[in-house]
Amino acid sequence: MDHYPTIDDRCVVAINKAWHIPLPCIDVCHDGSPTPLRPAVNGYLRDMLGAPKSVITNPPYKLPDCDRIVSQLIDAVRDNVIEMCAILVRVQWDNAKGRAEYFKRPFAGSIQLQFRPTWFVDEKKAAPIHSFQWLVWDNRHKGEPVVRYHNGVE
């Protein structure tokens, strides 16, 4: 595992167990480095075999950066540049009316985390106050979006 934007590995376990991730997979918010879902042979994008098929990332929280990145990822799925993308965001993120367009096809669903991720080593002593979810856009998904829940362990 090279890195991930949270020290809480349960976030990665949850999406890996709850969704099939097309390979290779990268994290665009961290210099295109492979995610710890299934990292590249030597841990660098240039070492990956073939173009990325999916993007899994924790986008920056600040506007307009977050929406710019997410809309580009969704467009990449819609245009079949990648098969799927997923973003790790707070549970209320998808309630903003300005983001309504994001939740048309190929929006596939969410994975609600049944734990609150820790972001820093010092935070393990205190319980974080925000709940998080993975939002998934996937061209392979058929039917209505699904809601899944995962505890980050099983």
Explain the meaning of each model-derived region.
Residues 1-154:
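Class I S-adenosyl-L-methionine-dependent methyltransferase catalytic core
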